[in-house]
Amino acid sequence: MSRVCIPDSEYVERRKKCVEMMKEQNLDVMIVNGTESDYANPRYFCGFWPLFERVGVAIAANGNAAVMVGPESVIFAGDVSRIKNIYPCLYYREGANPSYPEIKTNTYNDVIEDLGVKGKKIRIGIGGYMETTVVMMDGLKECYPEAEIVNADNIMVSLRQIKSANEIACIREGFRIAQIATDEVIKALRPGVTELQMVGVAQKAIYENGAEYEGLPMYVFSEKSTSHAISRPSYRVIEKGDIVQLNLSAKVDGYSPAIGLPVGMGKYSPEKKDLVDFCLEAHKWTEKQLKAGVLASDIAKGFLKFFEDNGRRQNYVYGPCHGTGIIEVEAPWMETTSDYLLQPNMTFQVDTFVSGPTFGLRWEKGIVITENGFESNCDELKYIELDF
């Protein structure tokens, strides 16, 4: 069965582009780290997503590359990684901190020297700086005490922010599946079910229709928990009159888009309808600003002003959009301090969230920037008040 995915040739091109940027910044080697929960940067280069353990990708300025994993992931990584040089390293072991006394492991010295990088006074860039643990950084400094170690996240953002045709195809396939899950949950919603039961409906739908995993922990929240910007579903029983927030997602070859919308369990009360309508209006305002060449901070500042002009400053939490791709929330965000211009084939979640004292809501969809505006990656969001 054919499936939507990133071809092996694209992984090779990614490493080549990375090497070009490394040379511009005089880097001898780049170490790109990730975890099970935030795997995006190393998976971008090798296609491997760890569990329990961590993962690192080492790329030398000469183009050679290797994958570093915990001792239990060597065979797993060897089977799925597009980079076939696999090194077991204790820096990447699981949090239980086993010592694995019977297993021969490698150090950063072993890996970097095998890639052809000689000497101790080298310049090392770190990609996935926030995902780099103290254990990883301490190990690198111990192996290379004379090295200059710098944050190289700017390289990762530059590489990942403009999407290829294959990446956009993966994102759109994820949206197709997430839409099916959304429709199935809406069909199943009724007074008396729990939030977690509805998560089960969504999970069944995404796996039956081709997802490798959920793109984010499925959001099915009701009433007070809808005021949480991020949260987890619970055993709460959904009742008539509730507002229910859905944010459902599907991962396709790592790419993890999400669809978010509120659902009324009956007609909204005047208070709820007022905030639901304002949030949708803010969402549509954002869409009108999106096109190549626009300064991201101008959109974010205008978005905040839209809240203030409508007397809604107290409901504002964060800016209007964030990047999406090989993880649901990725750089760049659109914030009042953002100094970049929108470019064609940037992909964003238009993520419009408002929070009140007793409830909140989110309208969220995915788009790709074009020269004259944007293309939607999913169906138009529906205004839903269920009838019971």
Model feature map: region roles:
Residues 1-388:
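Active-site neighborhoods and metal-handling regions in enzymes and metal-associated proteins
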